[in-house]
Amino acid sequence: MHSKSLSATLALTSLTVGLGLTSTARADFIEDSKLSLGMRNFFFNADNHSGGADQKEWAQGFKLDYISGFTEGTVGFGVDLEGMLGLHLDGGKGMHPAINTFTPSKSDGSAESTWASAGATVKARFSKSEIRYGNTLTPNLPILVANDGRLQLQTFEGGMITSKEIDNLTLTGGQIESVKGRASTNSTGLSVSGATHGSNKFRFAGGDWKVNKDLTLQYYYANLENFYSQNFLGLVHVLPITNDS
């Protein structure tokens, strides 16, 4: 029900934006758009020394991305679309654990031969700030990183705002409500390892201050409801290496 509601909302929003575009706005919305197709061939071999079954599987993945530009005006609107397809190529009986991070499983525990998912994120831009809401978010923050270490990318559902109104300072905040795993086509609540329940509220806020071209200071606060709160302090320093070093 939640996924259907989100899809309907995104479709209605996209339609509303499209009907209200001027010819100039359409040019920026379309001409600044990008369409890309990514392909990944992945062989996974896990030798389980703890006593469980080994995992040996081979699969092919496809990822189609459409990233629109923004409409003209004080507030610009856009939409990003994403589709992912997985094809299971090989992996015999006993080589596919029912619970894994590579390919989804059927009810009998065997690997799905094909699986697919699609999503969308609507976005708005005002001055040097952007707001995004949808189920294709891939944050890359000290307190939350979308994992891309398997055949398909992990994606999150929720809302994020990024502001660069102040020179050399990037502020980020938002709320994540669910996550789609790398071996899944469905979204679930967020959790931690070993937990028996999930949460639909991961709230965060923070910023990156670029002190100079080589030094960045970071602070982020995050809270996963019913699980934990976190304060993160970071320092990123780039040390240039030249031929004279």
Where on the chain are the PLM-derived regions?
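Beta-barrel outer-membrane channel/assembly domains of diderm bacteria
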Residues: 16-138, 163
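Outer-membrane beta-barrel domain signature
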Residues: 47-55, 105-113, 144-150, 190-198, ...
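Feature captures outer-membrane beta-barrel proteins of Gram-negative bacteria and organelles
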Residues: 62-69, 120-126, 157-166, 194-213, ...
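Transmembrane beta-barrel strands of outer-membrane/channel proteins
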Residues: 37-41, 79-83, 131-135, 173-177, ...
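Sequence/structural signature of outer-membrane beta-barrel proteins
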Residues: 42-48, 84-88, 138-147, 176-182, ...
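Solvent-exposed loop/turn segments connecting transmembrane beta-strands
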Residues: 56, 126, 138, 150-153, ...
